[in-house]
Each structure stands twice: as structure tokens, then as C-alpha cells.
Regions:
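...the same signal can extend to comparable exposed beta-sheet modules
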Residues: 1-212
Length: 212
């Protein structure tokens, strides 16, 4: 299923499934909210033998503590609290930079970057990809396809990730914004541009008036 469109395929009765790079034996993981599903028909009998599921979560980083290996996100959970991920809780933790090269998490996870995360179903493995791609553009319009928001920017259409980080009013149509993309080219965060048009206020602290 992609947004509001649904397709159906026939699986072999003994199919194997791989979820976020690890074997899985639970059909609940077959339909990721944000991800891809690849079907493989090894013996060409029109029944798929292998299902490869990539389930992504993309967030904007607020802070990373190298000591306790916690990533704190700007994104909030359903209780309004910052989402936090404890990397030390995983047996396997792999990170890659914008070029897709392996790197130490502490070297590439910085405030303001976007991380795209894949966690295994048994919560023993986590894979992190970092993106620092930012567009400074005017938001032309916003539409929706099911629960997926789509933004027209610079004549192109971009989909937002689930739980996209958008402070109040940052995605107002007609406004200029800093648009942060994740590794898949989807919008992970929208922030008001510092040079966006609007009133600017100031005040005078001291005034000297010379006698004429």
C-alpha cells in the first residue's frame, strides 16, 4: 500500500520475510507506515518466495550525548515529549553518512541533522543514516493523499514523513522555509527561514539629543 493506493500479490506458503535487514516471522511487519516492500519470485511461478521490508523512521536531531549514547529528537511522541533513542540498548548499531559510508555515530549525528532509522523487530539491531540536505524555498501549496502530506516546492512535489517536525506556522503556503530532506528525499522537517518576510522589531536603549 502506498498512500491511498492498494495492490495485492500472491505469496508462496513457505515465504521468507526480512524486516529491516533481519529475519522476521510475524505478518504484522508486512505493511510499514513509511517504507518499501520488495517481493522476490525465485522460481518464477508467480508466487513470491521472499519479502524484504524496509521500515523507516526519520527525525530531526536536537542533541546527542556521546557519554550515554542517547539521541534526543526535536520530534515529539504522543505524550508531547521529545523522542529519545538509547543506542546502548542495541546489540548491533551501524551508522552511515550522507555518502552511504560506514561511520561512527558520534561523528555524524549532530544537532540539526536528519537521521533515518531502521530497527529490527526484536529491537536488537538499529541502522542509522544521516542527511544534511536542506532546501531554502517557498512552500507553494499543501495537499494530502490519505495520511501523507504532500508539498509543492519549486514546481516539484515532496512527501512528508510520518510525524514530520514542523513548528507552528512553519509550513504556511506562500512562506519561505528551510526544508530538511531525509536520505530518501522525503521531507523530515520544515523550519521558518531566518530571512523569511515579516515584521522585525527593535527598541532604542539610549538617545542623545544635542542642543541646537
Amino acid at each position: 500500500k502506498t498512500s491511498s493506493q492498494t495492490a495485492r500479490y500472491v505469496l508462496d506458503r513457505t515465504f521468507d520475510a526480512v524486516y529491516n535487514r533481519r529475519p522476521v516471522f510475524d505478518s504484522r511487519y508486512m505493511m510499514p507506515e513509511y517504507g518499501t516492500v520488495t517481493l522476490v519470485d525465485n522460481n518464477h511461478d508467480d508466487r513470491y518466495d521472499v519479502v524484504i521490508i524496509n521500515d523507516f523512521e526519520s527525525f530531526m536531531v536536537e542533541a546527542y550525548s556521546e557519554n550515554d549514547r542517547f539521541i534526543t529528537m526535536k520530534n515529539r511522541d504522543e505524550n508531547g515529549k521529545n523522542i529519545r533513542i538509547d543506542l546502548s540498548a542495541y546489540d548491533v548499531c551501524e551508522a552511515e553518512n550522507e555518502a552511504g559510508e560506514r561511520a561512527e555515530a558520534s561523528a555524524i549525528i549532530v544537532p540539526g541533522s536528519v537521521v533515518t532509522i531502521q530497527r529490527s523487530a526484536d529491537e536488537k539491531s538499529i541502522y542509522i543514516s544521516v542527511s544534511r540536505e536542506v532546501m531554502k524555498e517557498t512552500i507553494e501549496s499543501i495537499t494530502a493523499d490519505g495520511e501523507t502530506k504532500k508539498y509543492s516546492i519549486g514546481g516539484n512535489l515532496y512527501e512528508a514523513v510520518p510525524n514530520c517536525y514542523i513548528p507552528d506556522g512553519a509550513d504556511t503556503p506562500g512562506s519561505k522555509a528551510d526544508i530538511y530532506l531525509d536520505k530518501n528525499g522525503r521531507i523530515a522537517a520544515i523550519m521558518k527561514s531566518e530571512d523569511a518576510e515579516g515584521w522585525k522589531y527593535g527598541y532604542i536603549q539610549k538617545v542623545w539629543v544635542e542642543d541646537a
